[in-house]
């Protein structure tokens, strides 16, 4: 089993926090001491609260999310709007120390990114750079419906170019029965990428035995 995973996504609001919580909840129920870590957040720290609740751990939101911007946008954009130097606010040393804290304290840590992999965290530093720095295997969260093929394949291609280990893709959210692409998207992604693909609708549980690739 790995020491942790990095959960990224094809876009914002595609179910990244939901999937991260489901993974943390499943691992905790399996008896695995699981930490959760969202290095940076904007708008609020509600994702950190949800992650803490899912993992059932005694941590505060400031520890789980050490870097925070009040405006709900990219961290770099928020730093410009708030007229704060992104290099000072987006403190990589602070993030690295927090990351090491979770890896040392917990058997397994679920790390959740922010937005997609090319969201700028500061000038010339993206989520993809943070993934490389942490060097954890990656799970890509994507939408079920129309348009997800392009977004998912672009994300996977970028990760492969960065030589990052990709564990698989999780399609999340509510299926639109009027969208015929929903019936074939998972299969097409699997055939093109040769990755494991899990379809996870809302309120569905993760069968860890059938989807052991999530942690191994």
From Swiss-Prot:
<keyword id="KW-0547">Nucleotide-binding</keyword>
<feature type="active site">
    <location>
        <position position="38"/>
    </location>
</feature>
<comment type="subunit">
    <text>Homodimer.</text>
</comment>
<keyword id="KW-0067">ATP-binding</keyword>
<feature type="binding site">
    <location>
        <position position="42"/>
    </location>
    <ligand>
        <name>substrate</name>
    </ligand>
</feature>
<feature type="binding site">
    <location>
        <position position="47"/>
    </location>
    <ligand>
        <name>ATP</name>
    </ligand>
</feature>
<dbReference type="InterPro" id="IPR004472">
    <property type="entry name" value="DTB_synth_BioD"/>
</dbReference>
<dbReference type="Pfam" id="PF13500">
    <property type="entry name" value="AAA_26"/>
</dbReference>
<dbReference type="InterPro" id="IPR027417">
    <property type="entry name" value="P-loop_NTPase"/>
</dbReference>
<dbReference type="GO" id="GO:0004141">
    <property type="term" value="F:dethiobiotin synthase activity"/>
</dbReference>
<dbReference type="GO" id="GO:0005829">
    <property type="term" value="C:cytosol"/>
</dbReference>
<keyword id="KW-0460">Magnesium</keyword>
<keyword id="KW-0436">Ligase</keyword>
<protein>
    <recommendedName>
        <fullName>ATP-dependent dethiobiotin synthetase BioD</fullName>
        <ecNumber>6.3.3.3</ecNumber>
    </recommendedName>
</protein>
<dbReference type="GO" id="GO:0005524">
    <property type="term" value="F:ATP binding"/>
</dbReference>
<comment type="pathway">
    <text>Cofactor biosynthesis; biotin biosynthesis; biotin from 7,8-diaminononanoate: step 1/2.</text>
</comment>
<dbReference type="GO" id="GO:0009102">
    <property type="term" value="P:biotin biosynthetic process"/>
</dbReference>
<feature type="binding site">
    <location>
        <begin position="13"/>
        <end position="18"/>
    </location>
    <ligand>
        <name>ATP</name>
    </ligand>
</feature>
<feature type="binding site">
    <location>
        <position position="17"/>
    </location>
    <ligand>
        <name>Mg(2+)</name>
    </ligand>
</feature>
<feature type="binding site">
    <location>
        <begin position="112"/>
        <end position="115"/>
    </location>
    <ligand>
        <name>ATP</name>
    </ligand>
</feature>
<dbReference type="GO" id="GO:0000287">
    <property type="term" value="F:magnesium ion binding"/>
</dbReference>
<keyword id="KW-0963">Cytoplasm</keyword>
<keyword id="KW-0479">Metal-binding</keyword>
<feature type="binding site">
    <location>
        <position position="112"/>
    </location>
    <ligand>
        <name>Mg(2+)</name>
    </ligand>
</feature>
<comment type="function">
    <text>Catalyzes a mechanistically unusual reaction, the ATP-dependent insertion of CO2 between the N7 and N8 nitrogen atoms of 7,8-diaminopelargonic acid (DAPA, also called 7,8-diammoniononanoate) to form a ureido ring.</text>
</comment>
<feature type="binding site">
    <location>
        <position position="47"/>
    </location>
    <ligand>
        <name>Mg(2+)</name>
    </ligand>
</feature>
<keyword id="KW-0093">Biotin biosynthesis</keyword>
<comment type="similarity">
    <text>Belongs to the dethiobiotin synthetase family.</text>
</comment>
